[in-house]
Amino acid sequence: MTKSQKRWLFVVVAVFILAALILAETTKHFLGRWIASTIYDNRAIFLSCDELPDLSDVKSVMEQHNQVIQEIKNIDPENIEITIDNSCPGKGSLIIYYPSHNDRTQIEELLGDSFFGIPWKGINR
């Protein structure tokens, strides 16, 4: 294989790898999640409006599990706030504001990936 052919092969492989990484990022958001979590200490959700539950379901689940809402707030009563994100018409998710990584860890231990099926975003402020 000549030097020119090796260079061409390298370019083709590099383009293929770059395309695969871009595709992976657009579907799984690895980099976005890493930046949100590691740099900002936030917990991001990457769902389209169509993928979010109905706003009425979000409100209903929050009412049904009010004791868990209170447990979350009791982690740091003066600094944790829980709201509904209704930026998508008719759809919703939870936003939990917390002051520290330790609080975030405790919230994640209580909730896991969702609040009884409702996606939640965590914001460190």
Q: Model-predicted segments: where are they?
A:
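Cytosolic/nucleoplasmic, non-transmembrane interface domains of endomembrane
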Residues: 51-59, 98-99
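Conserved short beta-strand edge segments in small beta-sheet-based binding/regulatory domains
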Residues: 114-125
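Short amphipathic alpha-helices in soluble, non-transmembrane regions
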Residues: 104-114
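Short glycine/threonine-rich beta-strand-turn micro-motifs
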Residues: 45-46, 77-103
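Short amphipathic alpha-helix segments
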Residues: 56-79
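Ser/Thr/Pro/Gly-rich low-complexity linker/stalk segments immediately outside membranes or between
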Residues: 26-52
